[in-house]
Amino acid sequence: MIMIFGIPIQAFLGQLLIGLINGSFYAMLSLGLAIIFGMLRVINFAHGAQYMMGAFAGMLLLTWFGVNYWLALILAPVIVGITGIIVERFALRRLYNLDHLYGLLFTFGLALVIEGTFRYFYGSSGQPYATPKLLSGGVNLGFMYLPIYRGWVVIASMIVCIGTWLLIEKTRLGAYLRAATENPILVQSFGINVPLLLTLTYGLGSGLAALAGIMAAPIYQVSPLMGSNLIIVVFAIVVVGGMGSIMGAIVTGYALGIIEGLTKVFYPEASNIVIFVIMALVLLVRPAGLFGRDA
């Protein structure tokens, strides 16, 4: 039997793959969070609640209207994105010129309200969401049995992350968004509707969280607590990558997911804290994060 640092290679590769799967969700959630902070300078504590809303939207669309997974994969992010647009338009926009603390407190309170509402109606226990038939079954890789759905999650996550990065960094719309963040008055003087851009940006970030939520539903079950259990880890990932850095959020999300998975092989007791240890070390050496820009 082949060993790596005293660990059977099957266990090593298995946890490597599981870490990549978890990293796919970390990357998507970190991406939405980084977009909102990078463009709006808002620390969005409601991101975990929006992730949970995406999962519930998919489940309720199936339960109430018989909407299948593939259609819900489109509708759930749109629904949650629209709720994000409403929140930004009528509440969050009023806080932009104030200290960041106000936005953080507002979104933290919003997260508590959303989570409390869903807990009141659906309880705290998880509810199953069936894997679509097209993605049921699995593949024997030799070192582990990989469910096809989890392989799909990794591929879909990479496509979404790369596509979003290209949208922000390589398109005219992305250039407008970045310029509006740096100098909104100048951009508005060219006839560009900056408030609308900011509203759509928050809607995009919310929609990305919801997309991650519905993709996670068949794996982790649907629960009002699923977002609150994850959001602190995602914030740590964004800090390590660099607050507001799109590429930093993506790369760090995948990397720390893999590191967390491998830690479960070599030192399982530390697997729940390894991301926070890395965050502390990075902040000591590079306070702006690995991909962030120094102030």
Feature names for model-found ranges:
Residues 1-28, 57, 68-72, 98-102, ...:
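Membrane-interfacial amphipathic/re-entrant helices at transmembrane-helix boundaries
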Residues 11-64, 86, 90-98, 102, ...:
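Single transmembrane alpha-helix segments in multi-pass membrane proteins
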Residues 22, 144-222, 246-252:
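Helix-loop-helix "hairpin" substructures at the membrane interface of multi-pass membrane proteins
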Residues 66-110, 117, 251-256, 286-287:
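Alpha-helical transmembrane segments within multi-pass membrane transporters and channels
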Residues 2, 11, 90, 121, ...:
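Cytosolic-side transmembrane-helix boundaries in multi-pass membrane proteins
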